[in-house]
């Protein structure tokens, strides 16, 4: 049993309020979360019974032209330009008149992520902390996704599939830490999809992965799945070879290279494969790999629940394939959230940070607010968990 309110709320109130700042990649998010003083069951897991109320969830995305990615310096400039106005908007939406009196803690993404954008956001967090005399909590970005997913879906102790632009991990909780059972050996799945979108020169708005998903739905030859590398090594997977292979196919398709017999009929020279077919084949291949390693983790930890978090977790086809796998397991369940919470946001940072704050995990000196691009999920001690 742990004290679920190690640090009491401000001014004798019966609730806590946290401001969360997220900016690890091209999305800048500001969120505000409210917790009651005590959960319904004082002996239980704080993160399961915290009864979070989302007061505000504001986000702005740095979007580049088709065929281009986002550079750290440009992304950081976007965050600097938008951070103050998003904070003001979030405070207004949450009806917070005096941050000094009303906000218990400011939570910021400490890592992992892109260095310059992370640094821009932590400077904003430090500034607000000094202006309002409010303590800080640094949050692991991956833990933020997990705790937000658990809060929204109420999944009790699932195997977590964390799929985003910079991370691909299969995770399960054990003994106060989120343990990584499997992960990518090279690039993340979101990175793979984004880079293929650049090859196709399709729009980056609302996101490259979403646009690939829409193209995949329109594939006219779903029965003719293009063969691609399938690289699963135990609990880990590799996606760089798949990307290299499909990039070459796309370039041959654009050039009209009829020597490529995968794309063109060897007798008539007619095109057999479309861009939509390539998108569909890439998705099916990548998602099959994810389902395989997730099922292996479920068997290992004897779990019948999967929680999909991260930006790629919004993909309906991934959710369908995972649900199909879970049907073959006793009482199998798939949990996922919509794009308000799957995609990077400030609320998830506020949620995870407030859980840590309530257990006494505050930053004692600004020297502890240095961000890190490499911050492993299993480095975090989850004091708020049973």
From Swiss-Prot:
SUPFAM superfamilies: Actin-like ATPase domain. It is an enzyme of class 2 (transferase). It is found in: Cytoplasm; Nucleus. It catalyses: L-threonylcarbamoyladenylate + adenosine(37) in tRNA = N(6)-L-threonylcarbamoyladenosine(37) in tRNA + AMP + H(+). GO terms for biological process: chromosome organization; maintenance of translational fidelity; positive regulation of transcription by RNA polymerase II; telomere maintenance; telomere maintenance via recombination; tRNA modification; tRNA threonylcarbamoyladenosine metabolic process; tRNA threonylcarbamoyladenosine modification. Belongs to the KAE1 / TsaD family. This is tRNA N6-adenosine threonylcarbamoyltransferase. The lineage of its organism: Eukaryota, Fungi, Dikarya, Ascomycota, Saccharomycotina. The gene is KAE1.
